[in-house]
Amino acid sequence: GMESKVIFIGPCVAKKTELYRSDVVDAIDCVLTFKELMVWLEQRGIDLSNCEESNFDEKPVRFAQLYPLPGGLIKTAGLKDDGLDTKLVRVDGFQNVKEIFHNIPKESSYTLIEPLFCSQGCINGPGISSIKNVFERRKDIIQYDRSIAGNDVVPEIYDEKIVKASYKKEEKIGKEVGEEEIQGILE
């Protein structure tokens, strides 16, 4: 109903600013990181280990759970990739993402660039709330994917609107700010 709200919950703090982009305005009401969700649950005295397990309302789209891993978008899109295809580029980590976008040749043969800002992908985002290391989290996601193998639900293709993001190399360097000015801003 009209009182319903859409909340994005994930590891990505960048989603908090994406919430205000003109192409998605009013699509999402609130963004929470996993850390914020855990704090909220704790404040309300909710212990997940005491909650009954339940299934998703709908079957998950095949491979969608791999999305937060490097190569996950490519796999979810149904593209064939063994990691050696020069037209499909998966890149993770700020420096690597910056490097690929600053060095794309004008006549590029790339079909798709999958940039994940966080090293090792979204499973290593700053909003993660897990005691497991990134490699254990990766293994858990892959095992979960394999546990639902055979579920070949493929999403419908929607003509309504295809959102496309483009990148234009544009360096903007502002004036240098001194320590005194920084302290003044923080006070």
Label for each model-derived stretch:
Residues G1-G184:
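Iron-sulfur-associated redox domains of electron-transfer enzymes in respiratory
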